[in-house]
């Protein structure tokens, strides 16, 4: 099996290596509460539905990764009427910490996974979110493995 050539992207305090044929769009943005954040939007080659969207910035005051994942779920999906013990947000071992997220198919029937994790650098708490999309959920695992192996924070 041949080794895939990687390229390094550095933006907003995140460094990551991805396949060199993939497309990257970066953006800085300000949340309504004034936090400055960075977004890295990565797409595979045309015709390949795999994508990774990373957001990274200071943790919102009074929040944590679980609250952020839950809020995102209910913002995107809404209240399904499920019982509390059927909470769709689950734990992930991600980036050496506990992340929280959920899986949901897209309108195009692609697999989609969203994870929030709290990462710390220089004694500060940061919110790291990752949205991955692929043809199958098994491909999502490969994308998450790639990120975990190739990411670093500044």
Task: Please describe what each predicted stretch is.
Residues 57-60, 76, 131-135:
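Short, solvent-exposed aromatic-acidic interface loops
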Residues 5-8, 102, 113, 138, ...:
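Acidic/histidine-enriched, beta-strand-rich ligand/metal-binding domains
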Residues 4-8, 13, 87-89, 116:
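Short, acidic/polar N-cap/turn motifs at the starts of alpha helices
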Residues 70-121:
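Signature of long, low-cysteine stretches enriched in small and polar/charged residues
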Residues 22, 126-154:
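Surface-exposed amphipathic alpha-helical segments
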Residues 4, 12-68, 109:
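Secretory pathway targeting signatures of secreted, lumenal, and periplasmic proteins
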Residues 1-7, 35-39, 93-103:
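Short, hydrophobic/aromatic-rich segments at coil-to-beta transitions
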Residues 16, 97-99, 126:
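Short, isolated positions in well-ordered beta-strands
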């Amino acid at each position: 099996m041949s080794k895939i050539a990687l390229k390094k992207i550095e933006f907003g305090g995140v460094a990551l290596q991805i396949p060199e044929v993939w497309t990257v769009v970066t953006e800085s943005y300000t949340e309504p509460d004034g936090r400055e954040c960075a977004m890295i939007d990565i797409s595979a080659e045309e015709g390949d539905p795999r994508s990774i969207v990373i957001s990274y910035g200071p943790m919102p005051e009074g929040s944590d990764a679980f609250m952020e994942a839950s809020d995102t779920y209910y913002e995107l999906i809404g209240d399904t009427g499920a019982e509390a013990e059927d909470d769709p947000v689950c734990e992930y071992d991600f980036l050496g910490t506990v992340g929280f997220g959920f899986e949901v198919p897209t309108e195009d029937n692609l697999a989609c996974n969203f994870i929030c994790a709290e990462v710390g650098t220089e004694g500060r708490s940061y919110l790291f979110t990752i949205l991955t999309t692929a043809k199958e959920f098994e491909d999502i695992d490969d994308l998450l493995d790639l990120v975990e192996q190739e990411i670093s924070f500044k």
